[in-house]
């Protein structure tokens, strides 16, 4: 949705294809644009699954450019479709972005930024810092600080102003996260904290905000894994 602003500023019309699991926020954005006086037909919204909605858009000859943020598999399909009509593309695809920490870094700032980079929006950001590479002389101290602070991250719903991290987008997403953690453990990495679904017991304890009610949300504890190598899945 953030790409709407640059598209309009450059004088373009647009078709916004929102993720199928989060259509309502895009609907609210479109309503706000209409209220601000955006002419009919300049901004357009389509909702639904990528195969049914996004795929035809990337193939349509009247679409001049496709900007996509998401997974590598989908990105390859879009690039292939776009090539048929020589569309321009801007593809921000999935990756494991590293934060590199040197021994002369401002320690507290580095810890805070590493945690924010990893757990902002519960890690559901294409630029999330899901890997941390630490200079060996600083490793133990840095990891200990990460674990200590991760254990204090407040978990809560989207309307809880004290919450520092929120729910995952779906139960399937949580199952995928849990499977990755299990695989890391099986392949020799160490799960230093987290590594399971969050419960009301957690939010009534050190992860609580005092007002946390998980309700029907899908949550996973902030998790720190140590000892991962390039050879691991």
What kind of feature is each model-predicted range?
Residues 1-109:
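Rossmann-like NAD(P) dinucleotide-binding subdomain of oxidoreductase/dehydrogenase enzymes
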């Amino acid at each position: 949705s953030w790409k709407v602003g640059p598209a309009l500023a450059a004088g373009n019309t647009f078709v916004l294809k929102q993720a199928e699991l989060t259509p309502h926020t895009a609907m609210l954005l479109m309503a706000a644009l209409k209220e601000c006086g955006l002419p009919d037909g300049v901004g357009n919204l389509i909702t639904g699954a990528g195969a049914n909605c996004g795929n035809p858009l990337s193939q349509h000859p009247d679409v001049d450019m496709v900007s996509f943020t998401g997974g590598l598999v989908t990105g390859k399909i879009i690039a292939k479709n776009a090539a048929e009509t020589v569309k321009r593309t801007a593809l921000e695809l999935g990756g494991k972005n590293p934060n590199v920490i040197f021994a002369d870094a401002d320690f507290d700032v580095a810890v805070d930024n590493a945690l924010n980079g990893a757990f902002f929006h519960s890690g559901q950001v294409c630029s999330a810092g899901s890997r941390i590479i630490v200079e060996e002389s600083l490793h133990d101290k840095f990891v200990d600080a990460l674990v200590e602070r991760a254990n204090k991250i407040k978990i809560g719903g989207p309307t809880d102003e004290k919450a520092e991290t929120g729910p995952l987008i779906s139960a399937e997403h949580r199952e995928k996260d849990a499977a990755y953690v299990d695989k890391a453990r099986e392949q020799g990495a160490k799960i230093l904290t987290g590594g399971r679904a969050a419960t009301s017991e957690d939010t009534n304890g050190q992860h609580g905000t005092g007002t946390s009610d998980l309700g029907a949300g899908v949550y996973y504890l902030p998790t720190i894994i140590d000892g991962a190598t390039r050879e691991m899945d």
